[in-house]
Amino acid sequence: MKNLVLRRDNMGEVLNELFEILSKDLHFNATKLNSETYEQNWKVPEGFISIIGIENAKMPVFYYGITNSYKKEFEIKKVISPKGQKQIFARIYYIFDRRDIIEKEKYVVANAFNGLLLLIKFDKTEFIEKAIEMLTKGYEEDNFIKEVLNNIKEKNMFDNIDETIRFVANRDYNWLIGRIKYNMGILEYSGQGYYLIPIKTNMQITPGIKINNGRVIIDLENSHLFKNFIVYVDTINNKIIYNKERLCNKNPAILDIMSKIDDNTCPWCGAKLRVVRTKKGEFLGCTNYPNCLYRRFPKKN
């Protein structure tokens, strides 16, 4: 069994939605580009944005090309730890064609833009639905995945394998998005929506972006990559966040969001935790169950 699934977004819809949101902010202008309109004999990025008049900006105006010509790969990653423990993780990768990126960079350089931004969209519902689909299929067809899921079911005291699969999908989503938000200093936001990541930082490929066999890969597991984001659009809270460290002269003070989180708060959904007692033992479970499957067990002495 191949634990890898490809999927493409509707790129026109992705760009339309992003530009519609950005156009509501006075600091952003956004325009679609195409080779026919601009009479170029090379490839042009799918879009162009300017960022104007932000406080303490390093430049009066920033100009960036935008490309969203990616395909997505979903994977159930199978791992054996140094101690011999079998593990599985749901993962997502955004794949760009390197030759396509190089051609679009020519347009960016020729027009003296500040850089080319890779646009990706991350959606919680899509990730969890795809992870559940792949884990369910894996449980039926892959002995490695089946063994790990059965172990997770017993360890976490779930009643059935469907609940276990939903737990793993949510666990992996929250792990990925939590690390990204921490590295970006945006723990108070949803993490869903649009990310604009520079292909290059200080004239080099941005740390965390993988180049492999003619592919430019954004792997969400490389969360340090997101420290270099230029713009993030939170589609759940309708917020636009730009990277002041990259665009402004004064570094912003990072809000101490972690101080607002205590041991009695669910890190997945923000609801309160409660003690759940079963025949197998007890644990702290989310009061939002069964919509949220988070649970924490007391540490063994």
Curated annotation (Swiss-Prot):
GO cellular component annotations of the record: chromosome
InterPro entries to which the protein is assigned, alphabetical: Topo_IA_Znf (IPR013498)
One GO process term, biological-process aspect: DNA topological change
Single Gene Ontology MF annotation: DNA binding
Domain of life: Archaea
Protein name: Uncharacterized protein MJ0664
Source organism of this protein record: Methanocaldococcus jannaschii (strain ATCC 43067 / DSM 2661 / JAL-1 / JCM 10045 / NBRC 100440) (Methanococcus jannaschii)
